[in-house]
């Protein structure tokens, strides 16, 4: 779908681009993801890390990540940096509450992404007492589709119970994420209504990009027509106003920009977003290939790496090749998301082109 941008949209994008240029120049760290474990109790069809219940890479010791936070605190205001705890499945760590207290005592707001399986009322209470500020739970369709995607019977019921519990508590910022695939795509309206029935206010939708297990599973990849249908669905849901639906930061969307997200597209990886992976690697988003890691906390100071490296993320002229070199939207897209680049720098997928 390579249609020309409307004049109004082009003007808005030009203004936004200038603001984005300033953000890139300043690269203020605003989100830090901590891959605290690679262990997981699910067997998701779309998993990019191919996690297992007993991972070969051990959990990162809390003290090691604490040193990273000390590096950040020495250079910036901790209140402005959100720590997002991910995995694997974070709830597999028995010391997660202790990790939360450590982050809280160092004055960082923190949240987590979970499948909800282990989120009992008792565990949730302890996490709140440890300073938990935000949470995201995954729900990939209604019962049959979710359990199929997650590879564990009963996972839908457990996720739903966790979602309802967090909503009813009303104590933290909360959203649900859904990975849209060919199987759950026809049922998105039913999923939306189910989530509204639970009382959910914010819902993020992703497509599944072809890496990890998903690279060899055609049931997970939407067609161009289905991607357009997804955009129209999000657009209509936002207009309806019963729930705030938003498409994820997966790439530039042409004339859907401004309609399916609250902001215009920008890949924040390496600009305001960084990650510390389970093996100590310093990266941007955890889903980006190891070829683009910028250092390792076991030999580098985190903030030194953040301030002196990450050039491939902040200067993307190296992406100006192949289809990107002839794309009329290059100056707004800047080569798409870093998670969509292979080990040779080639773009794996462009949603706009696919539409």
Roles of regions detected by a PLM:
Residues 33, 37, 41, 264, ...:
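Residues immediately within or flanking Cys/His clusters that coordinate Zn2+
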Residues 7-28, 287-355:
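Flexible mid-to-C-terminal extensions adjoining Fe-S/redox cofactors in radical SAM and related proteins
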Residues 13, 55-56, 60, 129-140, ...:
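Radical SAM enzyme [4Fe-4S]-AdoMet core and its adjacent flexible, acidic
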Residues 2-134, 222:
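Conserved alpha-helical substructure of the radical SAM core
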Residues 39, 43, 47-50, 270, ...:
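Cys/His-rich metal-chelating microdomains
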Residues 52, 88, 140, 208, ...:
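Flexible loop residues that form catalytic
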């Amino acid at each position: 779908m390579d249609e020309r941008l409307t004049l109004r949209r082009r003007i808005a994008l030009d203004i936004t681009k200038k603001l984005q240029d300033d953000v890139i120049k300043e690269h203020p760290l605003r989100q830090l993801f901590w891959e605290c474990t690679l262990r997981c109790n699910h067997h998701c069809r779309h998993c990019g890390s191919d996690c297992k219940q007993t991972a070969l890479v051990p959990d990162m010791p809390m003290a090691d990540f604490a040193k990273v936070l000390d590096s950040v605190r020495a250079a910036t205001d901790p209140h402005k940096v959100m720590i997002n705890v991910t995995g694997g499945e974070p709830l597999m760590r028995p010391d997660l509450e202790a990790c939360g207290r450590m982050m809280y005592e160092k004055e960082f707001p923190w949240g987590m992404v979970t499948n909800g399986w282990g989120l009992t009322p008792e565990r949730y209470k302890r996490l709140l007492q440890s300073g938990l500020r935000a949470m995201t739970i995954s729900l990939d369709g209604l019962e049959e589709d979710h359990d199929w995607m997650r590879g564990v019977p009963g996972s839908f019921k457990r996720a739903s119970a966790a979602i309802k519990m967090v909503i009813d508590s009303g104590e933290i910022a909360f959203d649900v994420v859904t990975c849209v695939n060919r199987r759950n795509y026809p049922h998105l309206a039913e999923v939306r209504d189910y989530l509204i029935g639970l009382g959910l206010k914010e819902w993020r939708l992703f497509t599944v990009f072809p890496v990890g297990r998903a690279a060899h599973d055609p049931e997970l990849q939407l067609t161009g027509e289905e991607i357009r249908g997804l955009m129209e669905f999000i657009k209509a849901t936002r207009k309806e106003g019963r729930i705030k639906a938003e498409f994820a930061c997966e790439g530039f969307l042409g004339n859907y920009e401004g309609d399916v997200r609250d902001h215009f597209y920008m890949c924040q990886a390496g600009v305001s977003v960084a990650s510390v992976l389970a093996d100590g690697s310093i990266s941007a988003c955890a889903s980006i290939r190891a070829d683009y890691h910028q250092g390792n906390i076991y030999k580098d100071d985190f903030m030194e790496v953040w301030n002196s490296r990450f050039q491939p993320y902040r200067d993307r002229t190296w992406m100006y090749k192949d289809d990107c070199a002839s794309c009329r939207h290059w100056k707004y897209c800047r080569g798409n998301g870093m998670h969509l680049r292979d080990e040779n720098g080639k773009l794996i997928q462009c949603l706009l082109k696919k539409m």
